Amino acid sequence: MAKVESFTLDHTKVKAPYVRLITVEEGPKGDKISNYDLRLVQPNENAIPTAGLHTIEHLLAGLLRDRLGGVIDCSPFGCRTGFHLITWGEHSTTEVAKALKSSLEEIAYKTKWEDVQGTTIESCGNYRDHSLFSAKEWSKKILDEGISDKPFERHVVD
């Protein structure tokens, strides 16, 4: 079985919230795809409930695209501690952390229910499992802790 990088990461050494560049892959024509670890809560100490995480996912899908070029996808980890962000090209972890911080600020302080995309039976595979209240509260908690652009030391972005 292929080795998966995220399963070799020592989850006891990281200091969430943080942004970490996992890998940059190069395609046959030279195109680069970057994979980032957007870790919102400390592994094995906390997990975001599914309804809040689901709503954050739907909001980040648009908000990160507004702030970063080349966003392909932002998908939650099964452990519910954060997200994979996949982009075309390369962004610094500082740039990604600032985009994440700005997105979470919008979720925490500006977003209304009508701003959340994909909350109907037609547009979401689990449309009943959303909570804007939870998304806002978790976003505030993460912002209060500060988002670091380094996974193993706290270097909080402005």
Curated annotation (Swiss-Prot):
NCBIfam families: PRK02260.2-4, PRK02260.3-1
Summary of the function given for this chain in its UniProt record: Involved in the synthesis of autoinducer 2 (AI-2) which is secreted by bacteria and is used to communicate both the cell density and the metabolic potential of the environment. The regulation of gene expression in response to changes in cell density is called quorum sensing. Catalyzes the transformation of S-ribosylhomocysteine (RHC) to homocysteine (HC) and 4,5-dihydroxy-2,3-pentadione (DPD).
One Pfam family per UniProt: LuxS
First-tier enzyme category under EC: lyase
Cofactor: how and how many bound: Binds 1 Fe cation per subunit.
Domain of life the protein comes from: Bacteria
Keywords (A to Z) from UniProt: Autoinducer synthesis, Iron, Lyase, Metal-binding, Quorum sensing
GO biological process: quorum sensing
Binding site for Fe cation: H54, H58, C124
Entry keyword GTP-binding: no
Molecular function terms from GO: iron ion binding; S-ribosylhomocysteine lyase activity
Family from the record: Belongs to the LuxS family.
EC number in record: 4.4.1.21
Protein name: S-ribosylhomocysteine lyase
Catalytic function, reaction form: S-(5-deoxy-D-ribos-5-yl)-L-homocysteine = (S)-4,5-dihydroxypentane-2,3-dione + L-homocysteine
